[in-house]
């Protein structure tokens, strides 16, 4: 599931065979209704779970960070974001208060609170049939590619991410099919086959669902980064 700036919530649901059962958009109430209707689920949320707690400021933490990092002066972010940024992965920085957070983050915080009320437990929890965790779409695609993805939201970026999902085994259209449908006439007349290309928010929701699939069925192919106090992010660790 993804909370973003333009469309509050985009969600995807897949099963243990990777079949896509749902892919849609909606408001918080729609996401709440969708999650409330699940009796057994592992939800991956593409949004910060909480504000930063100042871990990066702590002396014992800073001693463990790279002394030569260009991020040395950054302190208003979570440790997990610092670690991802240090690897070169572009991720948003979470402020130290909800008031300072952008609207899409506030919606994400609210969703996590609602999940708790619905009886979802933080992953991993062997005693709960409904669990959730935080993931990060850009970082997930980076891990699967082994390098920085093309610009998020651009046509080439969406096609690249769709190809990553296809190669990972997700039942999405092979992105190369897009090029097979282009002719000189169609290009000149604005008739590109855009209906076969997933949007950036849909791709983030699908990679979140894929990460949940791996976490639930092949946990050895998932890595986690961060600290429990501020939030741990789970990412696929099986390059295509």
What are these regions (language model features)?
Residues 1-240:
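RNase H-like (RuvC/DEDD) metal-dependent nuclease/polynucleotide-processing core
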């Amino acid at each position: 599931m993804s909370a973003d700036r333009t469309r509050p919530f985009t969600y995807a649901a897949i099963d243990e065979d990777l079949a896509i059962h749902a892919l849609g958009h909606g408001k918080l109430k729609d996401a709440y209704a969708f999650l409330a209707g699940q009796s057994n689920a592992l939800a991956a949320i593409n949004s910060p779970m909480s504000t930063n707690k100042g871990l990066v400021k702590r002396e014992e933490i800073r001693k463990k960070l790279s002394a030569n990092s260009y991020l040395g002066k950054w302190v208003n972010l979570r440790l997990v974001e610092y670690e991802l940024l240090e690897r070169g992965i572009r991720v948003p920085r979470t402020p130290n208060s909800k008031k300072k957070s952008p609207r899409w983050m506030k919606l994400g915080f609210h969703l996590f609170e609602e999940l708790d009320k619905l009886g979802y437990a933080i992953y991993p929890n062997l005693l709960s049939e409904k669990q959730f965790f935080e993931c990060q779409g850009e970082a997930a695609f980076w891990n699967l590619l082994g390098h920085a993805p093309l610009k998020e939201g651009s046509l080439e970026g969406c096609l690249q991410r769709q190809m990553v999902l296809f190669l990972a085994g997700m039942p999405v259209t092979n992105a190369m099919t897009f090029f097979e449908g282009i002719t000189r006439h169609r290009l000149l007349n604005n008739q590109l086959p855009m209906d076969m290309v997933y949007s950036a928010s849909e791709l983030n929701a699908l990679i979140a669902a894929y990460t949940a699939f791996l976490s639930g069925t092949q946990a050895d192919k998932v890595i986690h980064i961060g600290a429990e106090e501020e939030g741990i992010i789970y990412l696929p660790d099986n390059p295509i």
